[in-house]
From Swiss-Prot:
Homotetramer. Forms an RuvA(8)-RuvB(12)-Holliday junction (HJ) complex. HJ DNA is sandwiched between 2 RuvA tetramers; dsDNA enters through RuvA and exits via RuvB. An RuvB hexamer assembles on each DNA strand where it exits the tetramer. Each RuvB hexamer is contacted by two RuvA subunits (via domain III) on 2 adjacent RuvB subunits; this complex drives branch migration. In the full resolvosome a probable DNA-RuvA(4)-RuvB(12)-RuvC(2) complex forms which resolves the HJ. Residues 1-63 are annotated as: Domain I. The RuvA-RuvB-RuvC complex processes Holliday junction (HJ) DNA during genetic recombination and DNA repair, while the RuvA-RuvB complex plays an important role in the rescue of blocked DNA replication forks via replication fork reversal (RFR). RuvA specifically binds to HJ cruciform DNA, conferring on it an open structure. The RuvB hexamer acts as an ATP-dependent pump, pulling dsDNA into and through the RuvAB complex. HJ branch migration allows RuvC to scan DNA until it finds its consensus sequence, where it cleaves and resolves the cruciform DNA. Keywords: Cytoplasm, DNA damage, DNA recombination, DNA repair, DNA-binding. Its main location: cytoplasm. This is Holliday junction branch migration complex subunit RuvA. One of its GO terms (molecular function) is four-way junction helicase activity. Residues 143-157 are annotated as: Flexible linker. Residues 158-211 are annotated as: Domain III. GO terms for biological process: DNA recombination; DNA repair. InterPro entries: DNA_helicase_Holl-junc_RuvA_I, NA-bd_OB-fold, RuvA, RuvA_2-like, RuvA_C, RuvA_C_sf. It comes from Corynebacterium jeikeium (strain K411). One of its GO terms (cellular component) is cytoplasm. Belongs to the RuvA family.
Length: 211
């Protein structure tokens, strides 16, 4: 089991990062927020989880212990595998997950791609008592935390290839192309930062805004 890595970030995309440790490059999957916080060319220390299947071995990287525990705990729910658990955490933070389960908030759980009404209800029941200590259960204001969505700005100047990358990433997570495209345009229309977003910034903001 590979529980953690310390090394240099030598490559990364919207949903993966490659960390070189003692001359060996480890490619890890992770949420957009986690990947974005790992600076290319710098040394990082991350916690990881290796998921072994009959036809694959995938190393997942996490930004903190809460995210790693949420990833493992989500998979205790029937119908939730590693890929869906990561998709859920791409949209819902561990703290939001804890709050939604505590309040029986099925609507928040259904924000994640691949989580319908029945699965949301099952998650609320099966996770009861298992996720309450995942950070502080409090309102976090995800869109505001992104620090970029406001009353409008220069977001529409984003390069076409950035739009395409983010669209592909959202579709890969399980969102329909229509919903992904609509969300991207909505985020860009409200972008208030001085500069147009890069792919990571636009993806994080879109995940925070998608419903």
């Amino acid at each position: 089991m590979i529980a953690s890595l310390r090394g240099t970030v030598i490559d990364k995309g919207l949903d993966y990062v490659t960390i070189e440790c003692a001359g060996v490059g480890y490619q890890c999957s992770g949420t957009a927020t986690t990947i974005a916080e790992l600076p290319r060319g710098e040394e990082v220390f991350v916690t990881t989880a290796l998921v072994v299947r009959e036809d694959s071995q995938t190393l997942y990287v996490f930004k903190d212990a809460d995210e790693k525990r949420a990833f493992a705990t989500l998979q205790s729910v029937s119908g939730v595998g590693a890929r869906l658990a990561l998709a859920i955490l791409s949209v819902i933070t561990p703290q939001e997950l804890a709050r939604a389960v505590s309040n029986g908030d099925h609507k928040t759980l259904q924000r994640a791609p691949g989580v319908g009404k029945r699965l949301a209800e099952r998650m609320a029941v099966d996770l009861k008592g298992k996720v309450a200590d995942l950070g502080e259960i409090a309102d976090t204001g995800a869109v505001g935390a992104a620090g970029a969505v406001g009353d409008g700005g220069d977001g529409q100047a984003v390069a076409p290839d950035v739009r395409e990358q983010v669209l592909e990433a959202l579709v890969g997570l399980g969102f329909t192309e229509s919903k992904a495209g609509t969300t991207i345009e909505a985020v860009l229309s409200q972008w208030s930062a001085p500069q147009a977003p890069d792919a990571s910034g636009l993806l994080r903001a879109s995940l925070a805004a998608i419903k």
